[in-house]
Amino acid sequence: MRCLLVGGAVRDQLLGRPVGDRDWVVVGATPEQMVAAGYLPVGRDFPVFLHPRTHEEYALARTERKTAPGYHGFVFHTGADVSLDDDLARRDLTINAMALDEAGTLIDPWGGRRDLAHKCLRHVGAAFAEDPVRILRLARFAARLGDFSVAPETLALCRRMVEAGEVDALVPERVWQELSRGLMEARPSRMFEVLRDCGALARLLPEVERLFGVPQRADYHPEVDTGVHLMMVLDTAAQRGVSLPVRYACLGHDLGKGTTPAHILPRHIGHEGRSAALLAPMSARLKVPAACHELADLVAREHSNVHGSGNFDAAALVRLFDRCDAWRRPERFELALQACECDARGRLGFEQAHYPQAPRLRQALAAARGIDAAAVMASARARGLNGPALGRALHEARIEAVASDPACQRPADQAQQNG
């Protein structure tokens, strides 16, 4: 029985990156021998065991055979007769098909170390085409490694898989799992570039695919192309280290620009509402978590108002907070501001630009939330107000709190006073 370190841990060690979870393959053993040695069986589809002390995963070497379309259409074979080369041959990419033995010797039958040196993502063999999830994994690794290219033969194979309808059989949960992980990588734009290059983006996210080639006003967007802008926004979000809900909101904020009537281009009047309308079925189709979708919907509807809020007076600011439910959910509003700032910076030449809207909105919300709401309501009741009039009194008190805070003044008003 031989135990060897395999997969991502070997890859990351060779790259000099931090090694996360370590996966092991066991050659020359049976499930009964593993249990007898104290390993805890946990695998559902094939024999996987937890080490009795480290609790790391140890999987018996296996082969797999395609029996039906999609992600689940496989039959696995494990046994003491399955060799290490057999097991490595079923893996997706050469850089993930390496192993280290007990002595620290690298076993690399598919040239993974060479491809690491050349920064190339290359499939191991024809078995890659048997699992459509591997297209998503390939794209995710492109996002993680950033400057790695995809081998031409691998890209061609992915195109054939897409044309054969393999990605159409993917279950939504699996698509979201890989998409969400890719959004959290260092360069999310690379994931979408790879998916687009092989034709998978149009099948999986047609709402995003149609943004490429759609022009925007060059005075606002020097990069012009809406798809290019979206990629810049996603990479800005990654650079700023924001959370998954914020990154998904960035992904969905401009979907409506893909359906702008041609005769009004490059303007995009009303794209906010169209973005929200397209976002809802996309989130439902992918089974996106509620926290991600709700923030994305808010950002889609309100990002233009946030961008333009520098010209809002106190009353307009309070109305914005009303629409965003910022009184009850200030934390979500903060996430929306983060997404809007990524949007503003995700433009050619604006990557390091100041975004004064965010601090002003934070200050205005703090001022409005700082009033004693109970005292305002009690005073209103003492004046004989009730029903909707109580709500209006609270609304006016919030406006007054914002208007009286010097830090919340509009830049134009400050300039007049200073002049």
Curated annotation (Swiss-Prot):
InterPro entries: CCA_bact (IPR012006), HD/PDEase_dom (IPR003607), HD_domain (IPR006674), NT_sf (IPR043519), PolA_pol_head_dom (IPR002646), PolyA_RNA-bd (IPR032828), tRNA_CCA-adding_enzyme (IPR050124). Mg(2+) binds at D21, D23. Its cofactor is Mg(2+); Ni(2+). It catalyses: a tRNA precursor + 2 CTP + ATP = a tRNA with a 3' CCA end + 3 diphosphate; a tRNA with a 3' CCA end + 2 CTP + ATP = a tRNA with a 3' CCACCA end + 3 diphosphate. GO terms for biological process: RNA repair; tRNA 3'-terminal CCA addition. Magnesium is required for nucleotidyltransferase activity. Nickel for phosphatase activity. Keywords: ATP-binding, Hydrolase, Magnesium, Metal-binding, Multifunctional enzyme, Nickel, Nucleotide-binding, Nucleotidyltransferase, RNA repair, RNA-binding, Transferase, tRNA processing. GO terms for molecular function: ATP binding; CCA tRNA nucleotidyltransferase activity; cyclic-nucleotide phosphodiesterase activity; magnesium ion binding; phosphatase activity; tRNA binding. CTP binds at G8, R11, R91, R137, R140. The keyword Isomerase does not apply. Its EC number is 2.7.7.72, 3.1.3.-, 3.1.4.-. Belongs to the tRNA nucleotidyltransferase/poly(A) polymerase family. Bacterial CCA-adding enzyme type 1 subfamily. A single active site specifically recognizes both ATP and CTP and is responsible for their addition. Comprises two domains: an N-terminal domain containing the nucleotidyltransferase activity and a C-terminal HD domain associated with both phosphodiesterase and phosphatase activities. Catalyzes the addition and repair of the essential 3'-terminal CCA sequence in tRNAs without using a nucleic acid template. Adds these three nucleotides in the order of C, C, and A to the tRNA nucleotide-73, using CTP and ATP as substrates and producing inorganic pyrophosphate. tRNA 3'-terminal CCA addition is required both for tRNA processing and repair. Also involved in tRNA surveillance by mediating tandem CCA addition to generate a CCACCA at the 3' terminus of unstable tRNAs. While stable tRNAs receive only 3'-terminal CCA, unstable tRNAs are marked with CCACCA and rapidly degraded. This is Multifunctional CCA protein. It comes from Leptothrix cholodnii (strain ATCC 51168 / LMG 8142 / SP-6). The lineage of its organism: Bacteria, Pseudomonadati, Pseudomonadota, Betaproteobacteria, Burkholderiales. The gene is cca.
